[in-house]
A protein has these predicted regions:
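Acidic, metal-coordinating helix/loop segments flanking the phosphotransfer/catalytic sites
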Residues: 19, 35-56, 77
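Two-component/phosphorelay signaling modules centered on CheY-like receiver
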Residues: 12-34
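Short amphipathic alpha-helix used as the core "switch/output" element in two-component signaling
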Residues: 41-47, 69-81, 101
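Receiver (REC) domain switch/active-site region of two-component response regulators
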Residues: 113
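Receiver (REC) domain switch/output surface
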Residues: 117-129
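Alpha4 helix (beta4-alpha4-beta5 surface) of REC/receiver domains from two-component response regulators
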Residues: 70, 91-108, 116-119
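Receiver (REC) domain active-site loop signature in two-component systems and cognate sites
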Residues: 63
Length: 129
């Protein structure tokens, strides 16, 4: 059964990297990857009735406009059950604390350990259903 993952990042290279690192899972039908370049675009994507349903959001923190922490707060207000993993090159304690307060499921620092990330995604209750 396929599930959708929404990746939010304003850097095209990062989007390409996620596409490459999840290529096998996409071919196997495990994950359908969706991408948004901003927090506003991510909220628009979440409002759509995407099938298969989005079961997790992976969001960069440092983005112009609505940053990843603001996006996290908005998502948690609208869909408190949706796991959001923040992804950032800045792993400082303040960002980590703020992400946790806002309800982040996981705080991931770059460079991303994709094997670990895939394992975390497999552990999501909605991904196994």
């Amino acid at each position: 059964m396929s599930v959708s993952i929404l990746v939010v990042d304003d850097e095209p290279d990062v989007v390409d990297l996620f596409g490459q690192r999840f290529r096998r899972e996409a071919r196997q039908g495990t994950y359908v990857m969706h991408f948004a370049a901003s927090g506003v675009e991510a909220l628009d994507r979440l409002a759509e009735k995407i099938q298969p349903a989005i079961v997790a959001v992976l969001s960069d923190i440092n983005m112009p406009g609505t940053d990843g922490l603001e996006l996290l707060g908005e998502i948690k207000q609208r869909r408190p059950d949706l796991p959001v993993m923040t992804v950032t090159a800045y792993g400082d304690d303040e960002r980590r604390r703020r992400a946790r307060e806002l309800g982040a499921f996981e705080f991931i620092t770059k460079p991303v350990d994709f094997d670990r990330l895939k394992e975390q995604l497999r552990q999501l209750p909605t991904a196994a259903d």
